[in-house]
């Protein structure tokens, strides 16, 4: 499989915008959606970013790499040395590294990456049928 880097770059930027929007409009979104939306979008951005970087990898491998990255970041939130907490206190550091470990984040990452992988596999299936 060869992914189109332009498409994955556009999706990555679009997902970043949606993620920032989900934070800006969190006061009007339902609590259930707020629990998962931002982190699911963050994981989706990681998936599309990995798709951009590793354009020849199979969907499942891209998903595993993306999910592993998300899990490493989440579990790193259990570590609270002064230097890393200073990074987390910045806007960008907080967005990338997060603040505290939550099991709901693990669920959200899994949902976001599974959704992206499912969409990618669906699109690939449609493309294959058109070529037949």
From Swiss-Prot:
Protein name (database record): Uncharacterized membrane protein YjgA
Claim: Transmembrane helix is one of the keywords in the record: yes
Keywords: Cell membrane, Membrane, Transmembrane, Transmembrane helix
GO annotation, cellular component aspect: plasma membrane
Localization of this protein: Cell membrane
Pfam families, A to Z: DUF2809 (PF10990)
Membrane-spanning parts: 6-26, 34-54, 59-79, 106-126
Membrane topology summary: Multi-pass membrane protein
Organism: Bacillus subtilis (strain 168)
Main location, first listed in the record: membrane
Presence of keyword Hydrolase: no
């Amino acid at each position: 499989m060869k992914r189109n880097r332009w498409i994955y770059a556009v999706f990555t930027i679009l997902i970043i915008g949606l993620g920032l929007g989900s934070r800006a409009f969190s006061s009007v979104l339902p609590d259930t959606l707020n629990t998962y939306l931002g982190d699911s979008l963050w994981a989706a951005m990681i998936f599309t970013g990995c798709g951009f970087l590793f354009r020849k990898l199979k969907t499942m491998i891209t998903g595993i790499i993306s999910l592993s990255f998300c899990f490493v970041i989440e579990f790193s939130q259990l570590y609270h040395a002064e230097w890393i907490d200073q990074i987390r206190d910045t806007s960008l550091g907080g967005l990338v590294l997060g603040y505290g470990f939550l099991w709901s984040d693990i669920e959200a990452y899994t949902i976001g990456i599974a959704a992206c992988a499912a969409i990618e596999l669906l699109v690939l299936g449609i493309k294959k049928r058109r070529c037949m």
